[in-house]
Amino acid sequence: MEKLSEALDLLQEELLSLYEQNSQSLADQSRHWSLLRKEQVLLYYARGKGIMRIGMQPVPPQSVSQAKAKQAIEQSLYIDSLLHSKYANEPWTLCDTSRERLVAEPAYTFKKGGKQIDVRYGDSEENIVRYVLWLDIYYQDEFDTWEKAHGKLDHKGLSYMHGTQQVYYVDFEEEANKYSETGKYEILNQPTTIPTTSAAGTSGPELPGHSASGSGACSLTPRKGPSRRPGRRSSRFPRRSGGRGRLGRGGSGELPPQPQPSSSWSPPSPQQVGSKHQLRTTSSAGGRLGRLLQEAYDPPVLVLAGDPNSLKCIRYRLSHKHRGLYLGASTTWKWTSGGDGASKHDRGSARMLLAFLSDQQREDFMDRVTFPKSVRVFRGGLDEL
């Protein structure tokens, strides 16, 4: 058991080092998938020995580890083949070589430079489907030689040239038969560039974290099925100001009133502790006493967003090297559903909370601890811990 734990720790340290390097080398991406395969093999072996948990990490069923190991092997074969092509020296990020990116349409091709295309089907203004137009598509010809083509948009659909043949990987007419009764469709927007990597932390591109699929949070995938028109807000729920909501503690379900601003500083009542809905500002008004009184309303937290296994690696490292700098860490979790604003929570990535005793402890933590660029970090607060 101890040897298994040491082996898993070593693999995860190597993976976390790769994420921190933010490498654009295809050789490093090949190494990344090799490490993922080894991790799944180790977990498969551990479950076969009846081990349910290694350290803080649950051991999945053997069928899960086996399937993910096979995916990692297949991914490695494609990347290693690309390594021997004329495109090997191009910049390749973890996003570009992710599993989800590889199997997205057109399937089993590498893709770069996604742009979103919204198409409305039928007569309903809200019956909109989002697709991705890939600027560069790398495919294998009949001789298994890698070639590069540019994605195209026309009235018929999204396509690329496979040699001398134009291949449509999205056919709008076929999609119209699926999503509408009239067969009508309308392309709503000219291609608008979507960054293939998004801001991470305070700056820098976002890369996927460590996941068994290797997809991470950076992939651009089409939004299948009818959806609400972008920018449209449902009228079922009233609009509420403030950057952060809170769950009620029973009763009528109405939001508790906000504490009214006062001309003088006074401590919060027991009913007001944890009652603020907006993040604290960094204003120094009121001095240290004012800051402490403000902190009494909301215990401070940090929210880490990224790939779930990458967050687990970070939690492991924090528990061993920075244990005294924070109060506690949560398990990883994801947004699973929501209304119009759900997409901004990036349901493809996981979240993990770090709790602190005070704002000052949180700032000291931020000054001393660094995170890989694949992980976004932002501040928040909770009613209680």
From Swiss-Prot:
A Pfam family: PPV_E2_C
Transactivation domain: annotated segments: 1-199
GO terms for MF: DNA binding; DNA-binding transcription factor activity; nucleotide binding
UniProt region (DNA-binding domain), positions on chain: 298-385
Basic residues bias (residue ranges): 225-247
GO cellular component: host cell nucleus
Primary location group: host cell
GO BP annotations listed: DNA replication; DNA-templated transcription; regulation of DNA replication; viral DNA genome replication
Comp. bias regions, Polar residues: 189-201
Region listing for Disordered, in residue ranges: 189-282
Subunit structure as annotated in this protein's UniProt entry: Binds DNA as homodimer. Interacts with protein E1; this interaction greatly increases E1 DNA-binding activity. Interacts with protein L1; this interaction enhances E2-dependent replication and transcription activation. Interacts with protein L2; this interaction inhibits E2 transcriptional activity but not DNA replication function E2. Interacts with protein E7; this interaction inhibits E7 oncogenic activity. Interacts with host TAF1; this interaction modulates E2-dependent transcriptional regulation. Interacts with host BRD4; this interaction mediates E2 transcriptional activation function.
Function in brief: Plays a role in the initiation of viral DNA replication. A dimer of E2 interacts with a dimer of E1 in order to improve specificity of E1 DNA binding activity. Once the complex recognizes and binds DNA at specific sites, the E2 dimer is removed from DNA. E2 also regulates viral transcription through binding to the E2RE response element (5'-ACCNNNNNNGGT-3') present in multiple copies in the regulatory regions of the viral genome. Activates or represses transcription depending on E2RE's position with regards to proximal promoter elements including the TATA-box.
HAMAP family: PPV_E2 (MF_04001)
Entry similarity comment: Belongs to the papillomaviridae E2 protein family.
Protein name per Swiss-Prot or TrEMBL: Regulatory protein E2
Species of provenance: Canine oral papillomavirus (strain Y62)
Gene: E2
